[in-house]
């Protein structure tokens, strides 16, 4: 083991030539190569992802920066970042897809004693409102590539029941766009609407914006008014399709074909509403054979017409991905760091090529742990309504990694403006319902802490931490490039108007307590407002409706407030410290 010193700050351009070298040396993929391969069934492809491995790597800012061969407590040196703006709260968003029980029996269950007059589950609405989720993506996801938004508006008695071909599920359309907008208003969140770029035309996508955002006087705006919504919805954020590079996607497109379609749609949408924030489809993941090449080709077609580019990633603790090693698994958020840097590099490359003054931001609008309910009956609705699909049961180690993902998103929040935990309820979600109530899974807590305590701007940190090695160890070579991973992962935020700060700390050490000393250079915490940790002796422990408190936060002995603070971090833990200034 060694002590690793690394710098943690929000992403601000290239920090290492390593990223550029990786981009240059990736094997090129001719446009359409993936399409010419034999057709791949969506569920078969999803099942096969486990054998590809996640591309785990020590991030460039962890490489070659001050390794020392001494042992000792971890230290974090914290300071303000001059000129830094507050991070966008949308980086802590979530996702609701017409998939499984996410919508029906999740947020919407008319006739239930737990539902209100509109059919919204009041217990779920209360949980989401308490979380203060800033933005929710809807309606998909794979679902959106075969979705006709007109089926889900107007009188409910006239809405058709159709077969969703993405998940082989009966879709009643009893919950649609206007219902979602009403639900967003009830829970206090902002809508992020997805568009059908699979079977859908540019004309239909533009009509959707007109329906939602134009006040009156046109075919589609007046249709909305006849549906009982006199005022426009004013939806600002839109996804231009979903995972259009994927062979599992309805209406899969080649990169330049998609880029041209996105450009055309965006130009027309901005005539209706120039203030729209439009997100183009990036590569579906680092496992794709066209990863980064897809992003470049898409942006070469539509760079100046879009505002953001999407990223998606899911992780799991399996034999193929991590060798079933908790230590390797808990380092996977560093792969998310690398993923962000590589895609940002492509965006900046295209910006330079096109001599554009616009700098794209990133939308990490699908991220989570997902590896158990990934194939077979877990992904096939078998032509039924609201089937149990993708219902992962999350344990302690899953929650710790979700905490790591939160840290990664926050420290990259000057480039990642929007991010969505996929998903919100029942489907790979922190909340699960039955007919009697709602359960908080283990992953609820790190997400809730970030929403509650992380405010203002992300601070610069310089961290010294003892490390442990991550090596391929017989796994696929692309899974883990040899490197050292810090036991302690830290992020800090500062809300000066609110006179508060927060520390979010992951201890990856699965056996030993770790000590962390935090030194504040230009901030003086005066009191500890809260100090909690998520830990336990069993990494595989999980919550159930019968035992809902197996994995819950515990009070942690608070450090003495001041410009030098020492924390005792339990093994296998994610900790929050809320400070008053």
Positions of predicted regions on the chain:
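N-terminal secretory signal peptides
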Residues: 1-40, 65-67
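Non-catalytic accessory regions flanking glycosidase/transglycosidase catalytic cores in CAZymes
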Residues: 41, 46-57, 61-294, 299-308, ...
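Active-site cores of enzymes that catalyze phosphoryl transfer or operate on phosphate-rich substrates
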Residues: 305-311, 326-331
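Active-site His/acidic residue clusters
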Residues: 313-328, 377
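Acidic/histidine-rich catalytic cores and adjacent linkers
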Residues: 380
């Amino acid at each position: 083991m060694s002590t690793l010193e690394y710098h943690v700050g929000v992403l601000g351009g290239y920090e290492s030539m390593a990223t550029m070298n990786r981009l240059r040396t990736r094997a090129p993929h001719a446009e359409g190569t993936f399409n010419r391969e034999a057709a791949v069934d969506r569920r078969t492809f999803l099942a096969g992802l486990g054998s590809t491995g996640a591309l785990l790597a020590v991030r460039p800012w962890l490489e070659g920066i001050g390794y020392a061969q001494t042992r000792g407590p971890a230290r974090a040196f914290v300071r303000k970042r001059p000129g830094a703006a507050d991070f966008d709260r949308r980086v802590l968003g979530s996702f609701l897809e017409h998939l499984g029980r996410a919508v029906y029996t999740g947020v919407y269950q008319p006739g239930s004693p737990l539902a209100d007059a509109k059919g919204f589950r009041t217990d779920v609405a209360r949980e989401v409102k308490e979380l203060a989720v800033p933005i929710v993506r809807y309606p998909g996801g794979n679902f959106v590539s075969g979705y006709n938004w007109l089926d889900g508006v107007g009188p409910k008695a006239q809405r058709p029941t159709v077969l969703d071909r993405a998940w082989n599920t009966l879709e009643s359309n009893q919950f649609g766009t206007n219902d979602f907008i009403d639900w967003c208003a009830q829970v206090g969140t902002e809508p992020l609407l997805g568009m059908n770029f699979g079977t859908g035309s540019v004309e239909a996508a533009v009509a959707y914006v007109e329906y939602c955002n134009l006040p009156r006087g046109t075919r589609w705006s007046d249709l909305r008014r006849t549906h009982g919504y006199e005022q426009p919805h004013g939806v600002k954020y839109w996804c231009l399709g979903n995972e259009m590079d994927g062979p599992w996607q309805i209406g899969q497109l080649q990169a330049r074909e998609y880029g041209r379609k996105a450009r055309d749609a965006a130009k027309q949408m901005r005539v209706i509403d120039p203030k729209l924030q439009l997100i183009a489809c990036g590569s579906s993941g680092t496992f794709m054979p066209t990863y980064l090449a897809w992003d470049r080709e898409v942006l070469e077609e539509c760079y100046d017409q879009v505002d953001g580019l999407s990223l998606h990633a899911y992780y799991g603790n399996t034999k193929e991905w991590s060798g079933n090693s908790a230590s390797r698994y808990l380092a996977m958020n560093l792969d998310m760091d690398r993923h962000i840097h590589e895609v940002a590099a492509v965006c900046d490359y295209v910006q330079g090529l096109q001599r554009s003054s616009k700098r794209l931001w990133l939308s990490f609008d699908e991220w989570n742990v997902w590896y158990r309910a990934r194939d077979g009956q877990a992904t096939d609705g078998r032509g039924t309504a609201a089937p149990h699909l993708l219902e992962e049961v999350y344990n302690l180690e899953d929650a710790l990694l979700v905490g790591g993902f939160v840290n990664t998103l926050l420290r990259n929040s000057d480039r990642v403006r929007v991010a969505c935990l996929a998903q919100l309820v029942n489907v790979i979600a922190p909340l699960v319902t039955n007919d009697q109530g709602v359960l908080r899974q283990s992953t609820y807590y790190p997400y809730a802490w970030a929403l509650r305590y992380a405010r203002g701007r992300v601070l610069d940190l310089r961290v010294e931490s003892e490390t442990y090695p991550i090596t391929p160890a017989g796994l696929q070579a692309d899974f883990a490039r040899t490197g050292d991973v810090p036991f302690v992962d830290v992020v800090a935020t500062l809300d000066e108007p609110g006179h508060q700060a927060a520390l979010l700390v992951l201890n990856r050490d699965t056996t030993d307590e770790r000590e962390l000393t935090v030194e504040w250079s230009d901030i003086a915490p005066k009191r500890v407002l809260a100090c909690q940790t998520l830990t336990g002796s069993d990494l595989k422990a999980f919550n159930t409706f019968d035992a809902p408190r197996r994995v819950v936060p515990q009070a942690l002995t608070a450090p003495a407030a001041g410009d030098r603070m020492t924390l005792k971090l339990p093994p296998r833990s994610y900790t929050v410290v809320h400070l008053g200034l």
